[in-house]
């Protein structure tokens, strides 16, 4: 029987007291994960609309003899329980993005304008692969593994809070999550001992001036001009008002104003995001945005509205749980392939889980220059190297077993 070299490498390092799986099962499991990833990629659904996605996940879990419970509208939870012991949760998010796919594959998105551009299709598939492995060994399992298929990571307030509110983190000893990322090569893993991701907030600004004829700006209050100054001066918050050793990002994503070339705009609207790690810096940036806005509007005789929406909190890992993932990942991909980068400025509602119980979130490299898989997450040409999925499946599987003790 042919076994890929990657499978042989994994088998070579498997501890006998941790892994009880045959070579045949491993090949079948990997094929299953790829098949599932392609199915979900072909049929993406937006946040809180993952009805068919949820239905298919339920079908796959019920084939394994598991009792599946709904959480919220489209979230799912299922337990695999052996003898009495600890409880470890594994999480996969299941929603897609409003992106029109530009990849040409046999499994390209069939839902126009919707795409798994952040790899959640792979997350679902890998957790289903873990479920298959664990279900086969249920009789030898010491404890419970809780499978969390979470809706709406991409849309604050997110689906994680539903599991917390419904009590599915009670008496859970640890939780693990992973995320595919194309900027890290396939065969590599990135872990974070403590802070992994940032506070991810949103702000909205509306500036109200007075419209007028384009030839008579002195008789108007130009909201577009004020907004333009505001976009520029915002960058002084990070460069001049926060310590250099406490990172922050302030980005304006949209600016809408005016409707005709010769009419001075009476109104302007901006939206943007703020990313921070430190709670004090988060508050300072929030306040400084309004301070600058107020000063500009006062200087030009305009008024304003300002809304600041706190999004997902910073994702802070538990060092002990991360140490387990480090050890397992070293066994699966090799110690030299386990990276420890600086925290990412992205946001993740997995952070709500780690505020409640010990947990850890890591990145699985799925980029591959040789296969031209290099597009960033959230882009219309994003893809994953499917050869990396076996690593993510194995790391999640073995992390659960090791955390159970």
At which residue positions do the language-model features occur?
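Histidine/acidic-residue-rich, glycine-tolerant segments that coordinate divalent metal ions
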Residues: 97-99, 104-115, 122, 137-265, ...
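Non-cysteine beta-strand/loop elements that form the S-adenosyl-L-methionine
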Residues: 89-91, 203, 361-366
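Metal-dependent amide/peptide-bond hydrolase catalytic core
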Residues: 228-405
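Acidic, Ala/Val/Gly-enriched low-complexity intrinsically disordered segments
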Residues: 6-9, 13, 18
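Divalent metal-coordination and catalytic microenvironments
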Residues: 40, 78, 90, 120, ...
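Acidic/His- and Gly-rich active-site-bordering loop/insert found
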Residues: 18-116, 121, 125-142
